[in-house]
Amino acid sequence: MTKQHAFTREDLLRCSRGELFGPGNAQLPAPNMLMVDRITHISEEGGKYGKGELVAELDITPDLWFFACHFEGDPVMPGCLGLDAMWQLVGFFLGWQGLPGRGRALGSGEVKFFGQVLPTAKKVTYNIHIKRVLKGKLNMAIADGSVSVDGREIYTAEALRVGVFTSTDNF
């Protein structure tokens, strides 16, 4: 069976309901916390480290929920949502690889913010470069990522770590 290498908004919504990778396996959050509209490319090869990459997008409109509350009179997308989107995508990669369990963000190395997403923006693009996938007692991916708005890079994150767990009882 050939793996799918791009995913629509409807595919991602199916993933948020647990219908894409099967019950008990990696899910994306449901809207409003789903910070991705489509994955335009996912591969087990390529990227900066030759171990896999993802490219995904979020369409920006002035009526997105976070602009009304962050900040009143000075609307800007919270940087933590861009960081969470990168974790979401690393977890999606693990599910796409067929690794069982529920995804959990486990941390990151250095995160830098040097730009912002305003209501006038059109599109956010996420680029994820897989550095390593650990398979065994702990199934985990480590990746570097970046967030761009309308073609300009505005955030970077190193060593994004996400694991998948068949039980989160002792987490």
Swiss-Prot record:
Q: Where is this protein localized, as stated in its record?
A: Cytoplasm
Q: What name has this protein been given in UniProt?
A: 3-hydroxydecanoyl-[acyl-carrier-protein] dehydratase
Name any one Pfam family assigned in the record: FabA
Describe its partners and assembly state.
Homodimer.
Recorded GO molecular functions are:
(3R)-hydroxyacyl-[acyl-carrier-protein] dehydratase activity; trans-2-decenoyl-acyl-carrier-protein isomerase activity
Function, as annotated, reads: Necessary for the introduction of cis unsaturation into fatty acids. Catalyzes the dehydration of (3R)-3-hydroxydecanoyl-ACP to E-(2)-decenoyl-ACP and then its isomerization to Z-(3)-decenoyl-ACP. Can catalyze the dehydratase reaction for beta-hydroxyacyl-ACPs with saturated chain lengths up to 16:0, being most active on intermediate chain length.
Question: Is Heme a UniProt keyword of this protein?
Answer: no
In its UniProt entry, the species of origin is given as Pseudomonas putida (strain W619)
Q: Which family does it belong to?
A: Belongs to the thioester dehydratase family. FabA subfamily.
Q: Which UniProt keywords apply?
A: Cytoplasm, Fatty acid biosynthesis, Fatty acid metabolism, Isomerase, Lipid biosynthesis, Lipid metabolism, Lyase
The membrane-spanning stretches of this chain are: none
Chief localisation class: cytoplasm
